[in-house]
């Protein structure tokens, strides 16, 4: 695990500039919000997520997270059909603060186009980008 400005940036993930991460697992993509995002939002109290079977589109909103500070759109890092929604996050949204990269994942999708990964950051680029965030 790499730390940049007190933010965890795990290796092996892709990152979007909308503060979401993607982990490729057996041709599927697991999606969640980054440590930076959860720290900016502070105490997350609600997550509105789409349903299994729905399709999300890269760079388009697919849900929201609500904190004591703000309501923020979730922006899809990839296009694909939703295979699984993390109901634990809907029941216990604090998981997004406590464990954003493991228990706090949001969606598991079947990506429509793996080439879209080229338009988001790999780990090395993400580390450099996180250095510019405050």
Model-based region annotation:
Residues 1-61, 94, 98-114, 119-134:
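Acidic, low-complexity mobile loops and tails
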Residues 22-24, 68, 85-88:
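Residue-level recognition of beta-strand microenvironments
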Residues 57-73:
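Charged, well-structured alpha/beta interaction segments
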Residues 60, 66, 86-87, 111:
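Conserved "cap/hinge" positions at secondary-structure junctions
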Residues 73-77, 110:
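Histidine- and aromatic-rich ligand-binding microenvironments
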Residues 76-79, 123:
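ATP/adenylate-binding site constellation spanning eukaryotic-like Ser/Thr protein kinases
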Residues 79, 83-84, 90-97:
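Charged, amphipathic alpha-helical coiled-coil/dimerization segments
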């Amino acid at each position: 695990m790499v730390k940049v400005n007190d933010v965890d940036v795990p290796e092996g993930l892709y990152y979007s500039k909308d503060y979401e991460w993607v982990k490729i697992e057996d041709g599927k993509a697991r999606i969640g919000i980054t440590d930076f995002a959860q720290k900016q939002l502070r105490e997350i109290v609600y997550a509105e997520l789409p349903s299994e079977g729905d399709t999300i589109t890269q760079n388009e909103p697919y849900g929201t997270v609500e904190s004591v500070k703000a309501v923020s759109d979730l922006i899809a890092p990839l296009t694909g059909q939703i295979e699984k929604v993390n109901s634990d996050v809907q029941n216990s949204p604090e998981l997004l603060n406590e464990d954003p990269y493991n228990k706090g994942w949001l969606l598991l999708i079947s990506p429509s186009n793996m080439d879209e990964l080229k338009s988001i950051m790999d780990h090395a680029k993400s580390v450099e980008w996180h250095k510019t965030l405050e």
